[in-house]
């Protein structure tokens, strides 16, 4: 039985709640001592993990819609992607304001360059910013064939973000490995498309070097 448009609308409502409830929990934890001994790190890790969850959920939609024969599920993909960007922005903001502090924001650029895991993080965020900004149907029409080329960069984020997470923790625990494994699995489901994109990129580079 296929989902109807009305059911997908209610599913979107549930997904919005799924994006909002972690924020409400975090606000409660901050105000009621629900965080650990290092609340700043806890906030950074929580916001980062939540962004990663929404990234993985976004990547899950296409194969799920295909294998479950639920084409209308695709309508939830943009919503999940925007929540991913929102939580990634909270993650970046928590680092800038809580780790560095308002008086040391001038150091942000230096930190992003000198710490490789932060470099991967900011590259991922910039890509997500571009994808969020161009996610509307109006931008899709305006960009034409270039829209899909741009949005294929989500696969690069799926590689960089788990590495950023693994690199940022001092002690490797099962959790970041699980996220990395899920990202690899979701990318593996698209191996034909990724191989095609890689071959196209290699051909373009070869043509430019041959000039």
Curated annotation (Swiss-Prot):
Cellular component GO terms, alphabetically?
A: plasma membrane
Q: Please classify the protein's predominant subcellular localization into one broad category.
A: membrane
**Would the keyword Zinc turn up in this protein's UniProt record?**
no
Entry's transmembrane regions: 10-30, 82-102, 116-136, 153-173, 178-198
Which prosthetic group or cofactor does it need? FMN; heme b
**Keywords noted in UniProt:** Cell inner membrane, Cell membrane, Electron transport, Flavoprotein, FMN, Heme, Iron, Membrane, Metal-binding, Transmembrane, Transmembrane helix, Transport
What is the cofactor note?
Answer: Binds 1 FMN per subunit.
Q: Which Pfam families does its entry note?
A: Ferric_reduct
The keyword Flavoprotein is assigned to this record = yes
Which InterPro entries does the entry link to? Fe3_Rdtase_TM_dom, MsrQ-like
- Membrane topology term: Multi-pass membrane protein
User: What one GO molecular function would you report for this record?
Assistant: FMN binding
List this protein's GO terms for biological process. protein repair
Q: Tell me the compartments it is located in.
A: Cell inner membrane
Q: Which PANTHER family match?
A: PROTEIN-METHIONINE-SULFOXIDE REDUCTASE HEME-BINDING SUBUNIT MSRQ
Q: Subunit info? A: Heterodimer of a catalytic subunit (MsrP) and a heme-binding subunit (MsrQ).
Q: Which family does it belong to?
A: Belongs to the MsrQ family.
Q: Which NCBIfam families match?
A: PRK05419.1-1, PRK05419.1-2, PRK05419.1-4
What does this chain do? Part of the MsrPQ system that repairs oxidized periplasmic proteins containing methionine sulfoxide residues (Met-O), using respiratory chain electrons. Thus protects these proteins from oxidative-stress damage caused by reactive species of oxygen and chlorine generated by the host defense mechanisms. MsrPQ is essential for the maintenance of envelope integrity under bleach stress, rescuing a wide series of structurally unrelated periplasmic proteins from methionine oxidation, including the primary periplasmic chaperone SurA and the lipoprotein Pal.
State the protein's name: Protein-methionine-sulfoxide reductase heme-binding subunit MsrQ
* Naturally occurring in which organism (per UniProt): Escherichia coli O1:K1 / APEC
């Amino acid at each position: 039985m296929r989902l109807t448009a009305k059911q997908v609308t209610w599913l979107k409502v549930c997904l919005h709640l799924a994006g909002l409830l972690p924020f409400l929990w975090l606000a409660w934890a901050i105000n009621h001592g629900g965080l650990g001994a290092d609340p700043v790190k806890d906030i950074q890790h929580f916001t980062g993990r939540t962004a990663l969850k929404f990234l993985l959920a976004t990547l899950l939609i296409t194969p799920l819609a295909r294998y479950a024969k639920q084409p209308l599920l695709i309508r939830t993909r943009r919503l999940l992607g925007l929540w991913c960007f929102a939580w990634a922005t909270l993650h970046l903001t928590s680092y800038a304001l809580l780790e560095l502090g308002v008086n040391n924001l001038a150091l942000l650029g230096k930190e992003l360059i000198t710490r490789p895991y932060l470099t991967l993080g900011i590259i991922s965020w910039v890509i997500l910013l571009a994808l969020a900004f161009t996610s509307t149907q109006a931008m899709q029409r305006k960009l034409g064939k270039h829209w899909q080329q741009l949005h294929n960069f989500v696969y690069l984020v799926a590689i960089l973000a788990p590495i950023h997470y693994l690199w940022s923790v001092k002690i490797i625990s099962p959790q970041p490995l699980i996220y990395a494994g899920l990202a690899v699995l979701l990318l593996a489901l698209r191996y034909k498309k990724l191989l095609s994109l890689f071959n196209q990129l290699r051909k373009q580079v070869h043509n430019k070097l041959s000039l």
